């Protein structure tokens, strides 16, 4: 089960730097199941990879997603400019994910389908809540965490694409420097800094929970 943790900015660690540390420490790249999927050496690697693509699409393949909702609710300024670019870039990632989901074949038969769908619905609702949050900084925290945490996810998608002969698009998400700039520029109060941290933590929590679910489904299929 995913555990919610907190990283607090210090005089030596800015709000933006704390966000990057948060993603590095709590993000998908450190999850054992993602590491195993990228390694791809197990006897059921292809099936597990297919399952991961399908569940990622269930979480992030719908429109509008977190980025678009956050952009719609954001006022003018630095955060809106960044979200506009991030939203356009993530839409390309979403379309890639949808196309790849069709290419990898059907969702692997796995016990506990109803429980899986309930977990995914809860995760989608959580992301929508973050994107719609009225707390200044919360949606931006979730959006910047999503962009930063997408890179290990993108490596997973590209591995699946290589298996089925699908050409991946060139990555176009905002880089780390732009994340630092927008977080530093948009969090001018302690309240907005706390809200940004909360949004980031909750996004990463949902990603870890997704890989927990994928790991449990892989184990269930092994006994099926």
Residue ranges, per PLM feature:
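Acidic, carboxylate-rich catalytic segments that either coordinate divalent cations
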Residues: 2, 190-224
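Acidic, low-complexity proline/glycine-rich segments
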Residues: 2-36, 115-118
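Short, charged, low-complexity loops and linkers
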Residues: 5-15, 39-50, 133-135, 159, ...
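Alpha-helical bundle segments that constitute or directly flank the non-heme di-iron/ferroxidase center
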Residues: 22-29, 36-74, 129-133, 137-154, ...
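Secondary-structure edge/capping motif, primarily at the C-terminal ends of alpha-helices
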Residues: 70-74, 104, 161, 218
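Active-site-proximal alpha-helical scaffolds that flank and shape metal-associated catalytic sites
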Residues: 78-175
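Accessory, usually C-terminal, subdomains that scaffold auxiliary metal cofactors
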Residues: 174-197
